[in-house]
């Protein structure tokens, strides 16, 4: 048997959705994985943080960024001092397909697939826009993008509709 050091982290794979998040927890010193459902509110986030802290080990959390639903939870987990990782949506879909032969986006196995990807190190860094002070830049960038698209749309409308009417 191999020695499990006290620094080996607890892994928490989170399948993010609008109302509730499914969490699969794997501790280095435990055989069985633990499943937890967390509603999308602060009280429930605190309950999860308490549970993860109770293992008395470093914690590494990973999830697929889903809309904006992951942001509040990621922020709280970051404040709690946990290491946060991102799982690429494309990599998750390909891995899910390879492991379970399933394309189903709402597969309950998603947390398992995320955990597998954590174990093989197929993760990306997660930079929380609020923590890193890039939130305003991100919002401005989104606004700029929307304005640019509207401008282009209007220009195309003028070119395709109004120009031919008069020339």
Predicted regions and their residues:
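Phosphate- and other anionic-substrate recognition elements at nucleic-acid/protein interfaces
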Residues: 1-167
